[in-house]
């Protein structure tokens, strides 16, 4: 059996090693256009709870993290000059170049042929191989060549991001939110060695343009960094990194693209890692996902009784649902980062801002499992400003008073637990009553219409909007438009348990939470 891997990233190297180990008679060749020590990017980060499948196949990653990486338990959120910390997160990171070096050693020891500075330009060059694994990254050329079969799609985020390192040593995963003269910028930062931290910066397109950071020529040769942006961000974040410099490595602005493919295989060609799928870096490690792909593909191919087509079908059958779950869970987090400037400016209390951030993908209860003391502090903050806990706090608007934040919903009435009701009418563009229903869209493409309806409702002087229909994410985005852009109270209607309802109110996403009669 002859197997070619296009790309010597972690996924490709790990797959080649595992396959060669399980099938020593196979000829496994890795083609890589760059040199062995060429590495773009800085560190790779992993959650402690997600490494079991990789470790079971080969402990190389755990060994790299233990011997060469950095480990931490807390996440820190910096905003408005204050710092909020939450524990129980259990994460580790290592320099990408170090991990690649160890993976190259493993592959070499198993007898994998690694051909560096050897770029495959024509698929015909690999005609004599029985299997070709395409692991050439998110911008995969071969995925594009076989686009009719793979059916690739990309959802491009509106936010801009750029990847740097810094010699300032963060002590764990830290999110730094900085309001500057041109807009709000935020950094995802974490240590990757004893002398370097990763420093990823995001901002919205308008702030990026106002700061004059749109002048970098994307045709600049690979490897060169955007020095103007580097200087700007060093100055903007100077106090946060104690004047330390940023370190560039092919650092240039981009928009994150969530990539999917209708099929992961085309004949003997199969996609692996970022070539097949991506998930926003705020919740998913592309390296981890690629290495898990490698484990699954090597396992299905390792059984001699199974043909290559059967193995590829089983690989996709096993991995696709797991990957899609990660991508789906990443969407609320990606959306948060597309709107974080609004949140920085809307939430004056660092406690509520941090809780809003930390619950973008999980509810209060799951956060409490990780750090009960932190959630107790958030609850205490609420109690200092209100009469009772989030769901037990009375709600007042105009002449109406409801005893709690839980309501029952009908077509023309929003009813409190004591039977008190707020009259509701559907949005119609005509004069409104006390409250107006806004129907959230089923997809984010429909949000502009719903947000326009919120604006018209606010301008008409109504007391409250109720948001129903749509998805959990679009309902929240419509409600936040009302609350944060127009200071208009919002009720969200859905099948919410008390934990999720508490999270919505405590985080400032909604004022009332209801279910239908």
Swiss-Prot record:
Induction (free text): By salicylate.
Any GO BP annotation: catabolic process
InterPro entries, sorted: FAD-bd (IPR002938), FAD/NAD-bd_sf (IPR036188), PheA/TfdB_FAD_monoxygenase (IPR050631)
Top class in the EC scheme: oxidoreductase
GO molecular function, one term: FAD binding
Pfam families, per the entry: FAD_binding_3
UniProt keyword terms in alphabetical order: Aromatic hydrocarbons catabolism, NAD, Oxidoreductase
Reactions this protein catalyses: 2-hydroxybenzoyl-CoA + NADH + O2 + H(+) = 2,5-dihydroxybenzoyl-CoA + NAD(+) + H2O
Domain of life: Bacteria
Keyword NAD: yes
EC assignment: 1.14.13.209
Phenotype on disruption: Cells lacking this gene are unable to degrade salicylate.
Record keyword NAD present: yes
Xref: PANTHER family: 3-(3-HYDROXY-PHENYL)PROPIONATE/3-HYDROXYCINNAMIC ACID HYDROXYLASE (PTHR43476), BLR0106 PROTEIN (PTHR43476:SF4)
Family listed: Belongs to the aromatic-ring hydroxylase family. KMO subfamily.
Protein role: Involved in the degradation of salicylate via a pathway involving coenzyme A derivative. Catalyzes the aromatic hydroxylation of salicylyl-CoA to yield gentisyl-CoA.
Protein name: Salicyloyl-CoA 5-hydroxylase
Annotated source species: Streptomyces sp
